[in-house]
Amino acid sequence: MSTPRLVGRMIRRAQEARKSADANLSTGLFNLACISAYQFVQLMIRARILERTGLEPNVKGLWELLRTLAEVLGKQEEFSRFLEEVKADIEFLEELYGRSKKEPSSCTREEAEKFVMIADRIVGFIENVVEEVGPA
């Protein structure tokens, strides 16, 4: 499969995961909302790395994915400032994501809503930087 098609597929999967997060929030499946929102962020970052390099990243976790994307885009300084600003939020996502995978019903509505809001903020930042950098 060509890289542009694969990138498009990953972005569609990410958007589906984001919709799933909303659906899970509305039905009270808060741990699944967190898992879906995490997948949304991961897939969007991975898609943007693949779009620029032609390779899927071999790293795990949001920190490493974001650092890899910063390097690929040549925007380390901008990402560094953003990561410092959202450090506690990313730690919250990583901790709650891990807990949500292990224990059903492990988070509250408020935690899940916060999780989704942070996921949207991260993806919004990424998309703004990608747009600023321009086409691959």
Outline where the language-model segments fall.
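Terminal alpha-helical segments
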Residues: 1-136
